[in-house]
Amino acid sequence: MDSKEVALDSRMATRKSDLHLFSKYVSVYYQTGLLEMLRENGCDTLFICGFSTSASVRAVAMESPQYGVRPVVPAEAVGDRDDYVHRSNLSDIEKKFADVVPVQAVVDYLKGRGGNGRKKGREDGNLG
């Protein structure tokens, strides 16, 4: 995107192989090819980051289990225009649809994976 408001944080280390999806719809599953890509690559977990917690983040967290995908929301990597709306939706998402975890838990989990996307060491799939 061309706007700084929706640009990726410059502190993020990215690779050419990283997939960044931007959708004009509430669900990133709609017309992006995400589900097909996840299935083709044997991915069963999706880390959901972005804006807004009450709309897009919630929609994807709700839809993911229906497709056999485990939704994980790094708590500090999502937001909304209103803090109360953000916090209440994040709490509801955690109670009903997804694992809501600290960003550091995701970082630690991803550090334990090999360059080919396969797990090294732990096989239980837990983040923390």
Give the location of each predicted region.
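Active-site-adjacent betaalpha module
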Residues: M1-G128
